[in-house]
Amino acid sequence: MLTSFRLLALGAALAIGAANSIVVLAADKEQVIKDREALMKRQGSDLGAVRGYIEDKNDLAKATAGATDLIQTMQKIPDVFPPGTEGRDPDGKYAPKPEVWSDWKDFLAQRDTAAAKAEALLVAVKTGDKPNIQTAFADLGKNGCGACHAKFREEIKK
């Protein structure tokens, strides 16, 4: 009898804990989506710093800082896509496709590909050789970021 009571109490405690987790997730969902959009915009800014160097609009130090930060932000991508955070970004232009979560391993593999291409971009940036940087930049854009966005990001038509 006492064992049944303990199991019942344990079950109730687990149910309450699970319910509280769902409430926290619901409360945090909006913030996670905002954080996700901010991370993607930060990556865009990082790429802009590299593009600026290629186009003679800024110096190599800014391009290097951007390429370095891009590598760091790539590692944070899984953190801003936890389950239960489906939905449009705050500006309403994009939303992750359900495949982010249903094909999580492939999503992470795409991120790994993009991260490797970001590392190759940093190597190129450190040379200062603009044609080499342009090649690495284009590869990252098409086969890294672009490939992931093509498979896992939906543009919201207004």
Go through the PLM ranges and name each one.
Residues 1-11:
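Bacterial N-terminal signal peptides that target proteins for export
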Residues 1, 26-27:
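Absolute protein N-terminus
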Residues 10-18:
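Hydrophobic helical h-region of N-terminal Sec-dependent signal peptides
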Residues 18-26:
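Sec/Tat signal peptide C-region and signal peptidase I cleavage site
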Residues 30-62, 68-158:
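Sequence context surrounding c-type heme c attachment/ligation sites in exported
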